[in-house]
Amino acid sequence: MSLKHFIQITKPGIIFGNVLSVAGGFFLASKGHVDLAVFLAAMIGTSLVVASGCVFNNCIDRDIDLKMERTKNRVLVQGLISLKLALVYATVLGVAGVALLYKVANPLAALFAVIGFIIYVGFYSLYLKRKSVHGTLVGSLSGAMPPVIGYVAVTNSFDMAALTLLVMFSLWQMPHSYAIAIFRFNDYLAASIPVLPVKRGIQVAKKHILIYILAFLVATLMLTFSGYAGMSYLAVAAAMGMYWLYMAWTGYKAVDDTVWARKLFVFSIFTITALSVMMSLDFKVPTELLLTYAP
């Protein structure tokens, strides 16, 4: 048991990806007026809650992880940290994260963190991941919470922009997750996880991927059409979304589904990262605010 093991079970890669989306939502809402304390609380608080969820997930998935090539050497599977200690660790992380969001940001940000946690740990990890082909869809809601947390940490309200972020990031999760399930098909099959590609076939999954990416593309454009983001954001969102859609379309003629799915997965990360960055840089300041600060 070492510090490295405690870091590993929080899944740092997942935390980093979520932190980027928190920042995107935060800066979109801030519109150039950043409260540093609230920003740090949103980033650190969300990171702690996500880390907590990941540790709980590691605890719950020990039996599944043992059957999968990719996960059979994880810390808890190998017994490098005891289950009891991991559960205490996860609880401390979660409580600290929610408390930080509640005290420094606002109760609404803390509420969305709790909702995301409950969906991920309670509904997805404990039950739906193992029992339902729709587990990915329900789990996608938890993955969409970080940008919403970042946004409401500033606004303290759930408006159209927050709803758009929730829809955007939920829709993004679906093709992203299905792509993983395709190139890790044998792992999911061995662990009897009923993801769509395993349960209903890769060809059916390809159709769903195409539909979800199309819906995601439309949702991303709504930030500009609703007056929350600028034209530079729109250009990047349209370009990334259309190319991702094209990549999905090429899946119907793919010679090797594993290679195709891996490329689709990698581009999904580039896409959501680019949008998070553009939301941070190309927010749209309302006309009334511009008039307020006019000389």
Curated annotation (Swiss-Prot):
Q: Which keywords belong to this entry?
A: Cell inner membrane, Cell membrane, Heme biosynthesis, Membrane, Transferase, Transmembrane, Transmembrane helix
Pathway(s) of this molecule: Porphyrin-containing compound metabolism; heme O biosynthesis; heme O from protoheme: step 1/1
Biological process terms from the Gene Ontology for this record are: heme O biosynthetic process
What's any one GO cellular component for it?
A: plasma membrane
Q: Which Pfam families match?
A: UbiA (PF01040)
Q: Name one GO molecular function term.
A: protoheme IX farnesyltransferase activity
Q: How does it sit in the membrane?
A: Multi-pass membrane protein
Database matches in CDD domains:
PT_UbiA_Cox10 (cd13957)
Q: What is this protein called?
A: Protoheme IX farnesyltransferase 2
Q: Which organism is it from?
A: Pseudomonas fluorescens (strain Pf0-1)
